[in-house]
Each structure stands twice: as C-alpha cells, then as structure tokens.
Amino acid sequence: MTTRQRIYVAIAIITLIGLGNVLAQTQFKDQRSRAPRQHHNVALPTTAATQFGDPLADLTPTQLADFAAGLDEFQSVDTAESGLGPVFNNVSCVACHSDPAIGGGSVIHETRFGRIANGHFDPLAELGGSLMQDFAIDPTAQEVVPAQANVVAKRKSTPLFGLGLIEAIPDSAILQNAQNPKPDGITGRPSIVQDVATGHTRIGRFGWKAQQATLLAFAGDAYLNEIGITSRLFPQENAPRGDLYMLELYDHVADPEDAVDPATGKADIDRFADFMRYLAPPPRASLTQSAIAGAAVFLQTGCENCHRALMQTSSSTIRALDRKLVPLFSDLLLHDMGSLGDGIAQGTAAPAEMKTAPLWGLRARTPLLHDGRAPTIDAAIRLHDGEAAKVRDRYTRLNSAQQQQLLDFLKSI
C-alpha cells in the first residue's frame, strides 16, 4: 500500500468512526412450550444506529415490520412437538445470540470434532460429526465426542449485527481483496461455495469458515445444526451419533419441519434472514485522542492488510443497503492462521484456515477469538499466527503507549 493509499484509508477510518470534527480541530435452556409472539414496536431510526440491536436506518414501514416479525421469530422457543432435535445445541436463536443485545453473540460454545490422518481431515460424519450437539430430546440419543476423533475444537456464536450490509457486498469486491498484493507473506483466498438458497456458485462470507454465502442459507444451516429443525434448504435431519435407528426412534415430525406460513409465504428461516438483513451494524463508541492516534498505528502495524477497514455494497432495491460504505474491518477472505486455526475443515476451508473476523463491535464480545481463548484484545493479537505472524510480531515490538493507542482504537470501532 502506498503512502497516499494509507493516508486515504486512515482518513476513511476516522471519518467512519465519527471523527471528522475532531480531526479538524486536532490532527439457554428453558424448554417451555413455544411461547406466543410478543410484537415489538420498533421506532424507525432516521440516523445511524445508536445502540446494539437497532434496525438499519432508512427502512421502509414494510421492511421495519419484517424486521419486527423476524425479531419475534428469533426469540421463539422450539419443542420436540414443533421439531426440536432429536439432537440440538439450544432451543431458540436468541439463546446463543443475546450479548450485548438480541442479535449479538454469547460465551456459549459449540463443539466440533474430526480426525486428521496422513494430512487428510475426516469429519467422522458416520459418527455424527463434525458438529457435536450438546443436548438431545432423550438421554439415549445424547452425543459424545467419539474416541476416533483426534481434533476437538470449540466455537463461539458470532454476533449478527450488520450482516445485511455484508451480504450486500458484491462477490467481485471480495475477489478483488484476494487479488490485491499484500505484504508480510499474507495471501488470503475467497471461500467459493455452492449457495443452497440460490443454487449458484457464490463467495462465502458467513460463519467462522465463511461456509455460507447468503443469510437465508446461513439461517437454514443454523436452524438444522443448532436447533434440529429441517427446512426446505436443509431437509435431512441429523442422526444422533450418525445412528439412523436413533433418528427413526425420536424424529416424529414430518420434514421439512419449518413449513411455509401460507398467510405470509414465509417460513421461519425467511424471518430469521429478514431480522439479520435489517439489523444495523454495531454503533460506534466515543473517541479519545488515544484512539485517534491508534488508527495510524493500526495501519503502520499492518492490521489493515487483512482487517480491511472499508468495503461497499452494490446497488440494491433496498435503500438501506444501496451502495453503502461498510466499515466492517475484514476482507472476508480465508487465511492460514497456523496455530490459531481450529483444525476443522469445513466448506472449502482447510483446518488451519479461518475467515478474517470483522472487528466492528469488538469491544462487546469478549472473550475473543473463535474459541474464546483470549480474555483481552491484547491477548487476541498475541495469539495470531500463520499469515498474521509478522504483523503480530510488529505489534509486540511497539512501545506500551503505541500498543494502548491501538487497543483504544479497536475498542472504538
């Protein structure tokens, strides 16, 4: 990146985090029955989100109603009678996505396992892998990590704020990120997936491994694998421990369990996608002089080589998503993270590869990293490896004041 480009990115970062004026002056587990909906009155905002969980600005009344209906569905509780299980990780979406507001992440982890032998990853699908569900509708169906597994990984639930904007970023922009030359041995490659929602080959961008390309596919994947509800996109139930007898014994609801409501033409997964699509990105925190200085350190250290500050959505019939700048701080590419990888192959991602996590709202999601191993931002940086090793080392060589400036900046975005 040239000096001119670095200055441009720095100015863009500062402008996006609301510093134009400053710069001018300075340089689970409740298994109750499926609850009746509570309808939420959501005020249509006229400016950017002011708190976590707000809807996007510029939504139409119809879009805002879809957001509210999606929010209700997101909080609904499933039971065995409605299709829950036979194995599952929780009974509702909100159970794992509530911090610091509905649509956020949580400290709840899911367990992934597999076996690596002779350089090949086996998800042990015949034993229920690679995802182990923590709960079952009957104890005899309970899953465990099989003895054959030699890789076990934990993954936190991810925050959903701003995902509509990320969905609206064109594939071409992500491909361009991969093609742009990068220093420090950083490469990065797009996750090319078959999108079950459209049937098209797309660039994945959702999930720790960028394994889904659209919010509808992301919703359907989670509804099946986290709650055990089949849908038109994912119609095949998970067999407990891969045992088809157990599946026949405990799965009594006809598939797909997520049926389309004839009154609205929408199934639950459509409502989940509406909620995520119209959920605003994290609000910006107030800025300090230290955070302003930290923007420059962010660039100088090389963080922006992967955590790209800005991308832009393509044209859209949805005004709130139409040609918007997206300060996500991610290139949405897969990178070989060395020891920081989780050891699980998924989609097109190799065991050591992880998607660059967007940094917006970072201050609200400790502990950090995919498995929550880092209690602080500083610890998370120091645990970077693989392609990020040189940038990590550059950070460790900063003096304490520069490190604090960078940390203050990261807490502000």
Which residue ranges define each predicted feature?
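Periplasmic c-type cytochrome electron-transfer domains
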Residues: 6, 20-413
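Bacterial N-terminal signal peptides
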Residues: 10-18
